Amino acid sequence: MSKLYLMSLGCNKNLVDSEIMLGRLSAYELCDEPSKADVIIVNTCGFIDSAKKESINAILDLHEQRKKDSLLVVTGCLMQRYREELMKELPEVDLFTGVGDYERIDEMILKKTNLFSNSTYLQSENSKRIITGSNSHAFIKIAEGCNQKCSFCAIPSFKGKLKSREISSIIAELKDLVARGYKDFSFIAQDTSSYLFDKGEKDGLIRLIDEVEKIKGIRAARILYLYPTSASEALIKRIIASEIFVNYFDMPLQHISDNMLKIMKRGANSTRLKEMLNLMKSAPNSFLRTGFIVGHPGESEADFEELCEFVKDFGFDRVSVFAYSKEEDTTAFDMEQVPFKVINKRLKIIEKIVDEVIEKSFEKEVGQKRLVVCTGESSEGEFFIAAKDLRWDREIDGEILINESECGNLEMGQIYECEILQNLDKKLLAKALRKVDAN
C-alpha cells in the first residue's frame, strides 16, 4: 500500500479541507514520517506574512526529507493567492492546486496534473472526511468565502464571495458523524453569522441551530468566528437559550476605538460592540474569545491606549493579538504605514496585558465544577489525563489535567463532571467526580 504524509497549516477551516482530501485518499496508508511517504501533501495558509513564510519553509523542508520518486503536492490558500509566482519559484514541487479541487485530489495525483478551478470548493453531504485529532470532536464548515470588506484582509480576493452550504447538507454530515461516535462540534466559516445571507436569509444561523438541536446524540456545540455586524441580538439570545450550543462566544473584534473601527471598515462602532459583548457576558457560564490587530495604518497612540484599557477591563476569557501584516489586494496596503518599531513596541505592551487577562480567567475556574471531555494523555505525561472544558474549542482554549478520579478509570471521549482544584501556569488541575451520560 502506498504511503501518504499530509501537513495541514493555518486555521481549522484548512483542517477540514485536509480531512476531505484524506477521505479521497483513503486507499493510502497514513504515515508520520515524510521520508517514508510516496505522496506528500502540504495544505498551505496564505493569510498573513508569517503564515506565508511558514508554508514556504514547510514545503522546502519536506522536499529535503522526501524519498526519491515521491510526489510533493502543494495546495491551499497560499497556492490560490500566488499561483503564478510559486509555480515559477518552487521547482521542488511536483503538483500544484488551489482551493477549488480538494475532492479531485485523487484524480490529480493519479494523472499527475495541476488543477486550478475558478470557484472555491464547497463541501457537500457526499464529501467523505477522515476526522483527525479527536475521536469525539469535529469541525463543521458551514460556508466558504466572505462578503465583508475589512481593510486589512485579503481573504475575499482568493476565497471569493460568501457561499453557504445547504442546511440539509450540514445536517446529513452531522448525523453521519454522530453515528460514527462524534458528539462535540465546532461550527466554522470565515464569517459564521452571515450564514445563508447569500441566499437572502438573515436568520440562517438561527434556523441551523434549530435543526441541529433535533439530532439525538450531540452533547455540545459551539459557533466560532461571529462577525460584529452580521451577529444579531436574536442570534446571541438563541445561543443562550440552546441546550446543545454552549455559551461560547468567539467574535474577533480587531479593535475598539471608533476611529480604528471606521478605518478598518468593520461596520460597527464601539457602542454596538460593547452592547453585544455585554449580552454575551450575561449568559450563564459564558466564555468569551476575541482577537485584535495592533499597528494597523491610522492607529494613533490614543487609539492603542483605548484598546489596552478595554482589554484590561472587560474580562475576556481568551484573547489573541496580532501585529498588522501589510497584504496585497487590501485597502490598507496603500495607506501610510505605522513604523515597524512602533508596531513591535505596542505588541509587547498588549501581549503583557493579554497574559494577565487570560491568567485571571484561568484563576477564576478554581473551585468550579465543570463538565469536561477526556482527550487522551496530557502534555505533562502519563500521570495526568488530558481533558477540555465542554465549553471550549479543541486545543486553542487550554488543557485540563486530571490526576484524581472518584469514578474509576476514565474513558477517552467520555464526559465527566470535574472539580477544578488548581491553576498551574494556565493549566487546570482537576478531580473527576462522576461520569455524565451522553444525551
Swiss-Prot record:
GO cellular component: cytosol
Domain of life: Bacteria
Reaction equation(s) it catalyzes: L-aspartate(89)-[ribosomal protein uS12]-hydrogen + (sulfur carrier)-SH + AH2 + 2 S-adenosyl-L-methionine = 3-methylsulfanyl-L-aspartate(89)-[ribosomal protein uS12]-hydrogen + (sulfur carrier)-H + 5'-deoxyadenosine + L-methionine + A + S-adenosyl-L-homocysteine + 2 H(+)
Pfam families: Radical_SAM (PF04055), UPF0004 (PF00919)
Cofactor: [4Fe-4S] cluster
InterPro entries: Elp3/MiaA/NifB-like_rSAM (IPR006638), Methylthiotransferase (IPR005839), Methylthiotransferase_CS (IPR020612), Methylthiotransferase_N (IPR013848), Methylthiotransferase_N_sf (IPR038135), Ribosomal_uS12_MeSTrfase_RimO (IPR005840), rSAM (IPR007197), rSAM_horseshoe (IPR023404)
PROSITE patterns recorded: MTTASE_N, MTTASE_RADICAL, RADICAL_SAM
Positions contributing to [4Fe-4S] cluster 1 binding: 11, 45, 77
Keyword Mitochondrion applies: no
GO molecular function: 4 iron, 4 sulfur cluster binding; aspartic acid methylthiotransferase activity; metal ion binding; protein methylthiotransferase activity
Residues where [4Fe-4S] cluster 2 binds: 146, 150, 153
Family that this chain belongs to: Belongs to the methylthiotransferase family. RimO subfamily.
The protein's name: Ribosomal protein uS12 methylthiotransferase RimO
Naturally occurring in which organism (per UniProt): Campylobacter jejuni subsp. jejuni serotype O:23/36 (strain 81-176)
Lineage, broadest ranks: Bacteria, Pseudomonadati, Campylobacterota, Epsilonproteobacteria, Campylobacterales
